[in-house]
Amino acid sequence: MEIKVVKSELNNTISHNGKIGLILLATDQITLYEFDAILKDTGVLCFPSRVMMDSVELTPEVLMAIKNELASATKTILPGMALDVVALSCTSASMTIGVDEVARIIKQSDSKREIKEVTNPYSAIKKACEFLNIDELGVITPYSKEVTQGILDGMQPNIKTISAATFNNTNDNLVPSIHPNSIKDAVIEMAKDEKIKTIFVSCTNLNICRYIDELEKITGKTILTSNQVMAWDILRLAKYKKPILGFGSILEKER
């Protein structure tokens, strides 16, 4: 049988506003779930990979070891194609490794293609606070006290933490199971402190983005979360200007 070759038009119709490399932890269950909602219909599309982990217990040592997996994880994302942004989706790993080191490893992972920008939730929360003129936060995490303290210390000197709370759950397989009602209760309780104007819920593996609008209305505070600010920074770096509704006031603003 003769097989006929037919003409085809080549046109990027799914990621026309941005190709995003998204590096997830092996244990991550929530980032894609929340990004699918936030980035829907934007034409900014994420192409994920995952990093191996020495343990599901997020100790400083396990978080630091992720550094050794970043280059190989980046290389598996659309080999040979330019990426507008690559994001490491882990707040605590980005803090532990260092945001400059994360960016260096990712950008140098493949000399044969361009990676235009790099972000992560830890650098994104700092940029978001600068964008909103915020210099004080209340912080809620699922981490150990040790890792939580590292998050707080790394915010200094530009961002002061007024209050901090943790669910103290170091097993990252269990963090996604922390019920949204528990997270909401923690936010509402912290918001009772009149000195706190902004609350940051840290961790990309917490299921909270769909409740940000509700919490901002209940508390009258600005609510920021790891996936929300990372998505905001991705959109900013990809030069996507349109407002995103339903996931907090920061995404409704022009970037």
Please give the residue ranges for each predicted region.
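Short, acidic/small-residue loops that bind anionic groups at enzyme active sites
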Residues: 103-129, 215-230, 234
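Hydrophobic alpha-helical
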Residues: 186-215, 231
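Short hydrophobic/aromatic-enriched beta-strand-loop microsegments
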Residues: 44-48, 138-139, 159-166, 219-227, ...
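N-terminal glycine-rich phosphate/adenylate-binding segment common to multiple enzyme folds
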Residues: 66-110, 116-123, 198, 202-209
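N-terminal glycine-rich anion-binding loop in soluble enzyme alpha/beta folds
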Residues: 2-72, 143-179
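Conserved beta-alpha
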Residues: 105-109, 116-170, 252
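C-terminal functional extensions of proteins
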Residues: 224-255
